Amino acid sequence: MLEYYDKDKMLVPIKIWTESIDDIEESCLEQAINLANLPFAHDHIALMPDTHTGKGMPIGGVIACKNTVIPNAVGVDIGCGMAFVQTDIPVNILRDTVTGSGELIKVIVGNILRTIPVGFSHYGKPQTSAVLDKAQSEIERYNADSELLKFIEQGYYSVGSLGGGNHFIEIQEDENGMACIMLHSGSRMFGNMIGQYFNKIAHEMNDKYFSTVPSEYNLPFLPVDTDEGQRYLNWMKLAMDFAFENREVMLEKVKHIFTEQVEKYTGITPNYSDEINCHHNYAALENHYGENVWVHRKGAIHAAEGEVAIIPGSMGSNSYIVRGMGKAESFLTSSHGAGRNYSRTGAKEKFSVESVMVDLRQRNVVLGKTSKKDVAEECRFAYKDIDVVMKNQSELTTPIKKLFTVGVVKG
């Protein structure tokens, strides 16, 4: 762990889990320094080893705030996170079983792609959602923000859908040769609209009350003891619950497809175990260094001592199931993935579609994607080396499972 602290420029220090300060983009460090100058920042800022420039706040960044929430420090994909389940099916069965449509793994990937809406698509009819039903039953909690109410209705069409960008569904292989299922998704357009809406309100409030936080930081904030702050917390919690349910429903759909196809072609019924579902974009009230503070994790996972969590790699690389070590200086946090080395545009300029597809074939990875033209955006070369990230956070988490991509569905 490194510490960066210029007392002439910063109110609190920045603690960083990289090999060198030079491993961090200049713009990312600048954003972290902005965080370190916020008057309500508590004790220090933490940067995980996958950190890179975000909107206002670095991805892979953690800030604990006194009596304050920052919509941009949560981000617009509120509640984005991971889900995982272990199976007892050997991967060689998926690769060696040949069907009329090719290897069984290809059939499973194809069925997932046809069943789960990806990218901007959604279901043609409303889905069941206990989270949204509950919100409807207590709608008075949300009526003050009438502009957002329509997104509750629209959310019914997105429950159990993947999205695009770095979201994925993977069939993976553990070190014992067994198949696993992992997915990455969030609150879809629902959380996006909530994040944008309250970021705008925070801007307006900060202007109205002559905030000392420079507007160019892009970190407008809401005191939690205001009506606006409480409304944001209500909506944020709703988006987090929606994101959790979205992953839960999607995982059940993928398990159903996996079971159906494995039974159909092998006669074997899979068993499932060790299910995990966790957020990596959110704020939570926690106690650190003797104070109750709002801990914002933007692209970072809670890693309390003994807590089991998911750290995915990039498409075609390794992923990890980890156990947290409860490091106080990281605010009980670790990285949420590998972290980008290239922007999406930069990756497409640097790596061709052909080179990415060749790499996936060489690694024996089956790709399910409706359009390959933007595949370079999410290739493993666009991201940091996940094994280096894991090494740099060896005091934050202990790996308990190492996983390898077998098949992947992307938006």
Please describe what each predicted stretch is:
Residues 127-131:
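Interhelical loops and loop-helix junctions of multi-pass membrane transporters/channels
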Residues 51-52, 80:
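Acidic, glycine-rich active-site loops and adjacent beta-strand->loop/helix elements
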